[in-house]
Amino acid sequence: MSKTYHFIGIKGSGMSALALMLHQMGHKVQGSDVEKYYFTQRGLEQAGITILPFSEDNITPDMELIVGNAFRENNKEVAYALRHQIPFKRYHDFLGDFMKSFISFAVAGAHGKTSTTGLLSHVLKNITDTSYLIGDGTGRGSANAQYFVFESDEYERHFMPYHPEYSIITNIDFDHPDYFTGIADVRNAFNDYAKQVKKALFVYGEDDELKKIEAPAPIYYYGFEEGNDFIAYDITRTTNGSDFKVKHQGEVIGQFHVPAYGKHNILNATAVIANLFVAGIDMALVADHLKTFSGVKRRFTEKIINDTIIIDDFAHHPTEIVATIDAARQKYPSKEIVAIFQPHTFTRTIALLEDFACALNEADSVYLAQIYGSAREVDKGEVRVEDLAAKIIKPSQVVTVENVSPLLDHDNAVYVFMGAGDIQLYEHSFEELLANLTKNNQ
């Protein structure tokens, strides 16, 4: 039976994906959010989903309300629902109920969730009818689907309502210092989540924290080293992607190619292969569809402007920065790697300042944008982007949206824009600068 859903905070990456999924399943979907443009809204607009400004008038009693985790009682629509005793569900609570209708495949981990969810979704949907929800704002819904693939987020322990059949856990790392007290707190959260997985867990076997995870379901370890249950080996990394074999219990289960770059993407693919092998999916079909994966939004997204290569990536943690730069070097081994990075949140910048500097030193040159503060925090003046610049050994300087011209001081370079805030504004400024150079040279 068709329902009417109203999303409070529909532009959030998970929220927009869920909205698209429910829309495709035949439900009536609308939502509200702030006016500022966010990259997820293009998909919503293309689907014909109405996006409204926040207003009490948006809510009627016949609607099912789904509220984004960033919106609290001070939001006028949330306040209205509470005042009139109109029930609503948080995104993660709704998802926990929704997945009960499917055989569910979850992807959790500090880094690589979105790319791995995207890869697993792509392979499975090309083999059989599959619904999925990816953290880049992409979702697909089918009322007849047997399988559901989704991203499982650890922030504020939002993954605790989830009880999937299968789950990949890519890694454990200290992040979200505004919520987690340290690495032990992060590990405990993942351990509690792991206990809820019903059939099997697939975890990176070379992660010391992950190896401490205990769960009732069987745990399969994947990685590069002998001793793992699923081992990626005979690896060839080229400018066209990565080729490798995977063995399980001493037997080769397939030879695979992914058109993706960086060691982390080989690990992501191995996790997907392991999960689908245990779930009984034909490995020949898996190999066929791995070859055609085109990536997810804001994860190593490339464009060429005026013969200049620009890469856009969501990387906002030191581990992710290292992985993104590694991928750029694999694809463009003869080019200078220029990193343009915007720190995301003051709490993360303070907690990981030294690690950010070490990670950015993997690039050849570094440019920094002003720190992007979260809506949940206040700038107390405890850290400035200049503090990070001072710790970077490689050539580095701070740039503004209004003046990105220092980036032109490089020949034969690849420009890697990284961040989870509004780093795309800096990227667009650079693209305009390049386009104007073309016009002036004509």
From Swiss-Prot:
ATP binds at residues 109-115. It catalyses: UDP-N-acetyl-alpha-D-muramate + L-alanine + ATP = UDP-N-acetyl-alpha-D-muramoyl-L-alanine + ADP + phosphate + H(+). Pathway: Cell wall biogenesis; peptidoglycan biosynthesis. The gene is murC. This is UDP-N-acetylmuramate--L-alanine ligase. Its EC number is 6.3.2.8. Cell wall formation. One of its GO terms (molecular function) is UDP-N-acetylmuramate-L-alanine ligase activity. It comes from Streptococcus pyogenes serotype M3 (strain ATCC BAA-595 / MGAS315). Gene3D superfamilies: Mur ligase, C-terminal domain, Mur-like, catalytic domain, NAD(P)-binding Rossmann-like Domain. It is an enzyme of class 6 (ligase).
